[in-house]
UniProtKB/Swiss-Prot annotation:
Its cofactor is Ca(2+). Its main location: secreted. One of its GO terms (biological process) is negative regulation of T cell proliferation. Heterodimer: postsynaptic neurotoxin. Its EC number is 3.1.1.4. It comes from Vipera aspis aspis (Aspic viper). SMART domains: PA2c. It is found in: Secreted. This is Basic phospholipase A2 vaspin B chain. Disulfide bonds join 42-131, 44-60, 59-111, 65-138, 66-104, 73-97, 91-102. Expressed by the venom gland.
Amino acid sequence: MRILWIVAVCLIGVEGNLFQFAKMINGKLGAFSVWNYISYGCYCGWGGQGTPKDATDRCCFVHDCCYGRVRGCNPKLAIYSYSFKKGNIVCGKNNGCLRDICECDRVAANCFHQNKNTYNKNYRFLSSSRCRQTSEQC
């Protein structure tokens, strides 16, 4: 399933929300950093279950919950406006669900940056068998 997320990013090309989210992550953490989060822990990548493994994985759990609250458009495909100002992500003048999606992505990218010291390479490409605990509620 997590491979589907990688394929989705590649298929979207230079447009679409997942690409924008990837650009936010790279903007906060450095070029190509997004690859560190595509399949990490129990929640970073496609789907998610169990208990987040660390603060980095919890960023993904919270992001999944945030997307789950968005109504009126597809969070993985909708295109919103944002920019970087002095290293900070600033969501543009988006309305409704576009504003909500941008905020979900902004908060997650900042969360990755704030918790980069918790990143554990042992949680990359973690087997789903290590995420079988009962999932937390959002």
